Amino acid sequence: MQNLLPNGEWQMAAIMGLNDNEVEDICKKVKSGFVVPANYNSVGQVVISGEKEAIIEAEKIAKEMGAKKVRILKTAGPFHTEKLIESSKALRKELKNVTIHKFETKVIKNIDGEMYKDTDDVKDILARHIINPVNFTKVIQNMLNNGIDTFIEIGPRKNIIRICKKNTDK
């Protein structure tokens, strides 16, 4: 799907210390290009995604509004935004050849943090994941509300565990 990335210079940035509404307002204020929230990671941490110039402008506005930190992420695409509609369409097409079996365990959607009720809409939701923000805050809250209190991260870093800790009191 890398070959389906739109042309242009794209970036993502994590804004820390502002709430969701403040970050959404920042994105609306940006005049230099496309930028939108892409990941609602935790209370006080939202990742934005968009054109490089727009990210730079959003960073400036965020700092003026009192953001504790803005960190540019090492990415090269407008992930979790409508700019990846062609990738979403390509995935949707590929998923037509995939059989989704009944879940053996509960599965939570990144888009809204809700559990899948059945497998009927899995393919649609997977394709929508590419063009919609990740709502990790709601995912973690739903897991906690359903009695899940142990999180294991498999990977080279501990980014997800840090975000999980910010979403819990543990």
What is each model feature region?
Residues 1-132, 162:
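Alpha/beta catalytic cores of group-transfer enzymes, especially the acyltransferase/condensing modules
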